[in-house]
Swiss-Prot record:
Function: Methyltransferase required for the conversion of demethylmenaquinol (DMKH2) to menaquinol (MKH2) and the conversion of 2-polyprenyl-6-methoxy-1,4-benzoquinol (DDMQH2) to 2-polyprenyl-3-methyl-6-methoxy-1,4-benzoquinol (DMQH2).
Entry protein name: Ubiquinone/menaquinone biosynthesis C-methyltransferase UbiE
Transmembrane stretches, start-end: none
Highest taxon in the source lineage: Bacteria
Family label: Belongs to the class I-like SAM-binding methyltransferase superfamily. MenG/UbiE family.
Swiss-Prot/TrEMBL keywords: Menaquinone biosynthesis, Methyltransferase, S-adenosyl-L-methionine, Transferase, Ubiquinone biosynthesis
CDD domains noted in UniProt: AdoMet_MTases
Listed pathway(s): Quinol/quinone metabolism; menaquinone biosynthesis; menaquinol from 1,4-dihydroxy-2-naphthoate: step 2/2; Cofactor biosynthesis; ubiquinone biosynthesis
Binding site residues for S-adenosyl-L-methionine: T81, D102, N130, A131
EC numbers: 2.1.1.163, 2.1.1.201
Length: 258
């Protein structure tokens, strides 16, 4: 399942929130959203998840369980502010090397400054590039992680194929993403929170409601857990599975390059 489709005029289109846009138009629109929220990105995630993103990210790192060896290489995509990469490096006893890739320079600038303050620059590399066209050789990384970023990629299936390409044989893909709530009653509460509260809190925090409105809508347009797992299999991964967090508000997807 992919959100990309043929438009009425014969071109390719995809979704930007609840809007239909040309596939080539989505990335600049997404970039604008994250330029606006870069300095308040962690606060944004607190608003989007009621603070639970921190628990989910810790669970993601526990699932990865990075070894304490210096030649362990991780690619963290859409990881500009470094939140996942920092956790991976610390969990490895500051042995692992993480490449933080993001298409948004504002997000990377925030991450690099945070890494400097934490004394982690020796374990990290920051690369501005597109998830659909990774600037790395095949079989380069032991793990590929992406947290709350895959739904913003215009062509998700292309990004997944690139993930498969750059992973070493035996390498692991981990995708943490907002998902479809599967717990009765929680889905109603979460819808009310998402569409009524989140944009208003976003406006209070940043002075701009629009980025938060897009982010809420983008969650609803993202494939459900089973459909996204099928996309991961189609990209070539084996042993594909997912784990729901907080009743399905988020899900951690796992796949291996076998």
């Amino acid at each position: 399942m992919t959100d990309e489709r043929v438009s009425a005029d014969g071109g390719m289109e995809t979704s930007f929130g609840f809007r239909d846009v040309g596939t080539g138009e989505k990335q600049p629109l997404v970039n604008d959203v994250f330029h606006k929220v870069a300095k308040r990105y962690d606060v944004m995630n607190d608003v989007m998840s009621a603070g639970l993103h921190r628990v989910w990210k810790d669970a993601m790192i526990a699932a990865l369980n990075p070894p304490r060896r210096e030649n362990y290489r991780v690619l963290d995509v859409a990881g500009g502010t470094g939140d996942i990469a920092f956790r991976i490096v610390e969990a490895s006893g500051r042995k692992a090397h993480a490449t933080v890739l993001d298409i948004n320079g504002s997000m990377l600038a925030v991450g690099a400054e945070r890494a400097r303050k934490k004394g982690l620059l020796g374990n990290l590399e920051f690369v501005e590039a597109n998830a659909e066209d990774l600037p790395f050789a095949a079989n380069s990384f032991d793990a590929y992680t992406i947290a709350f970023g895959i739904r913003n990629v215009p062509r998700i299936e292309v990004a997944l194929k690139e993930a498969y390409r750059v992973l070493k044989r035996g390498g692991r893909l981990l995708v943490l993403e907002f998902s479809e709530v599967e717990m009765p009653l929680l889905d109603r509460f979460y819808d009310a929170w998402s569409f009524n509260a989140i944009p208003k809190f976003g406006k209070l925090i940043t002075g701009d409601e629009a980025p938060y409105q897009y982010l809420v809508e983008s969650i609803r347009k993202f494939p459900n857990q089973r459909d996204f797992a099928a996309m991961i299999r189609t990209a070539g991964f084996g042993r594909v599975s997912f784990t729901n967090y907080t009743g399905g508000i988020a899900a951690l997807h796992s796949g291996w390059k076998i």
